[in-house]
Design a protein with these regions (language model features):
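PP2C/PPM-type serine/threonine phosphatase catalytic domain
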Residues: 1-312
Length: 312
């Protein structure tokens, strides 16, 4: 499979924060139609700490994965995991004070491969695959407290949107972790001409989630669509940093029969589409449901201090 793309577009806005803690790879203005690796990182930790963490992760992960020759998604995943180990080491070297120790970042990653598109993420930054005639056909599932509570049936999708602790994430890239957070991977093989891949920090979703698909699929040049998205975020008084990459597929050649079969099924969505999460409490024994709830709360209480992202 050979995936051809238009020249990618990106933006990074500060929102209502004092400084920019999001980082992109490639840096704005450096991506071309030949670029095969993209990332958005959303730093946390306050002051300059989040900025340091996200910049370190974007630069290290980007540099090491972008030098990987064009190959399969399996080969790229191996390169990603090796790069992530090196990235943790780099963050450890930056950790020289108690305040810096609180820093961390999310990561969302996309690579164009010979057998499809490899997606990886840690935290609540997202990747969307949008098909103009169908809407969102894939999106990553946030590593967050609310999603864990939805998964065990304690919250519905609607309740999760207004839950007081919805900003707590359960995975992040941080220095000196005894058990370093691992990425969730997905290989997308149903890729078609006209598909859009959208990587973004959670600041984009803050006020625009319901209108995201409409804005991205407007019959306008790619750059204009992204400009409209940035302006909408500004007009709606988005508080958080908001940054994104938008990639449009212009041609797909040599697609496998597997991709054609998957295009007529829901297999691609089931694993990560939030709507596919089982929220039927009656389908789970009470003891098992409460066991997982208590386990989740205990684990997240220990991590919450490091994981709470500032939204002001």
């Amino acid at each position: 499979m050979r995936i051809t793309i238009a020249s990618p577009r990106c933006y990074a806005a500060v929102g209502k924060k004092e400084n920019q803690e999001d980082s992109l790879f490639p840096l704005k203005g450096n991506a071309t139609a030949d670029t095969r690796v993209f990332m958005v990182c959303d730093g946390m930790g306050g002051h300059e700490n989040g900025e340091v963490a996200s910049a370190c992760v974007a630069e290290t992960m980007g540099r090491l994965t972008a030098q990987q020759p064009l190959g399969t998604s399996s080969e790229m995943q191996n390169a990603f995991e090796k790069a992530l180990q090196e990235t943790y080491q780099q963050l450890d070297l930056l950790d020289k004070s108690d305040s810096i120790r609180k820093m961390g970042t999310t990561l969302t990653f996309l690579a164009l491969c010979t057998d499809g598109v490899l997606v990886a993420h840690i935290g609540d930054s997202r990747v969307y695959q949008v098909r103009p005639e169908q809407g969102v056909v894939f999106q990553t599932r946030d590593h967050s407290l609310v999603n864990d509570l939805v998964a065990i049936g304690e919250l519905t999708e609607e309740q999760a949107k207004t839950y007081p602790h919805r900003n707590i994430i359960t995975r992040a890239i941080q220095p000196h972790q005894e058990l370093p957070a691992k990425a969730t991977f997905k290989v997308l093989t149903d890729v078609r001409k006209g598909d859009l891949f959208f990587l973004c920090s959670d600041g984009v979703i803050e006020k625009l989630e319901d209108d995201l698909c409409q804005i991205l699929t407007e019959k306008l040049p790619l750059e204009k669509r992204l400009e409209n998205l940035e302006q909408e975020a500004l007009q709606r008084d988005t508080r958080d940093n908001n940054s994104a990459y938008l990639i449009e597929v212009t041609e797909v050649s040599g697609a496998s029969m597997e991709a054609e079969i998957q295009s007529d099924s829901t297999t691609q969505q089931d694993e990560t589409n939030p709507k596919a999460v089982d929220t039927d409490k009656k389908s789970r024994p009470n003891w098992l449901r409460w066991f997982f709830l208590l386990l989740t709360i205990l684990a997240l209480a220990l991590a919450a201090f490091f994981m709470m992202k500032e939204k002001g």
